[in-house]
């Protein structure tokens, strides 16, 4: 009985086809990996996790985790993906926190000019401990700049600005006028809704 079931498993594996998974154009259509499936439809909506280091070869970016969702077939055995979100590693965030300073978070839902909805979590770390009014003002800066950037950008441009530090730099330049800052990061993003094609 067991030999029959094991041969059935082997036969099922033989029937599966391997598909190559590629990143979106904004990440240079880099190879993300491969996945087996009987049918291409079985592979759709699977989520892939890589680090930015995996895509760029820059070890300094190993703490940035990227998430992609398989969209469909490009040609033959090649599958396309959409950026689904990112997150900074907990160890990296922990390494940034200092005593006698403030950690300020703001979560904001935004829509890009081409209709993609995302949830963005900004993180600001001050040099010294900030007052409540200063924290409130900094949260407003995070929200306002993030919304404005999204409204002015298409999805690919906004993702690029988030991942490669343009958005966090814009927030830093404005928020430092309120209180001395040590670091600004976009801690996490998640794609909430994509426009129907």
UniProtKB/Swiss-Prot annotation:
Record-linked InterPro entries: Ribosomal_eS1 (IPR001593), Ribosomal_eS1_arc (IPR030838)
User: Does Chaperone appear among the keywords?
Assistant: no
Q: Which residues form a coiled coil?
A: none
| Gene Ontology molecular function terms on file | structural constituent of ribosome
Q: Name one GO biological process term.
A: translation
Q: Which domain of life is it from?
A: Archaea
The UniProt keyword set, sorted, is:
Ribonucleoprotein, Ribosomal protein
Database matches in Pfam families: Ribosomal_S3Ae
Record flagged with keyword Ribonucleoprotein: yes
Q: Name one GO cellular component term.
A: ribonucleoprotein complex
**SMART domains xref list:** Ribosomal_S3Ae
* HAMAP family referenced in this protein's UniProt entry, alphabetically: Ribosomal_eS1
* Family to which this protein belongs: Belongs to the eukaryotic ribosomal protein eS1 family.
| Protein name as catalogued | Small ribosomal subunit protein eS1
* Organism in which the protein naturally occurs: Sulfolobus acidocaldarius (strain ATCC 33909 / DSM 639 / JCM 8929 / NBRC 15157 / NCIMB 11770)
């Amino acid at each position: 009985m067991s030999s029959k079931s094991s041969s059935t498993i082997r036969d099922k594996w033989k029937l599966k086809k391997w598909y190559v998974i590629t990143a979106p154009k904004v990440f240079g259509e880099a190879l993300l990996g491969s996945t087996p499936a009987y049918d291409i439809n079985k592979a759709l909506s699977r989520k892939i996790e890589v680090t930015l280091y995996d895509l760029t070869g820059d070890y300094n970016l190993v703490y940035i985790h990227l998430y992609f969702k398989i969209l469909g077939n490009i040609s033959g055995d090649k599958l396309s993906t959409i950026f689904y979100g990112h997150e900074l590693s907990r160890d990296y965030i922990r390494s940034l926190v200092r005593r006698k300073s403030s950690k300020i978070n703001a979560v904001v839902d935004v829509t890009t000019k081409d209709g993609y909805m995302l949830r963005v979590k900004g993180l600001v770390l001050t040099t010294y401990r900030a007052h409540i009014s200063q924290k409130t003002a900094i949260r407003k800066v995070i929200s306002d700049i993030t919304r404005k950037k999204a409204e002015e950008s298409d999805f690919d441009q906004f993702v690029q600005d988030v991942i490669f530090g343009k958005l966090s730099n814009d927030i830093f330049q404005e928020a430092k006028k309120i209180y001395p800052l040590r670091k600004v990061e976009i801690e996490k993003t998640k794609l909430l809704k994509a426009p129907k094609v």
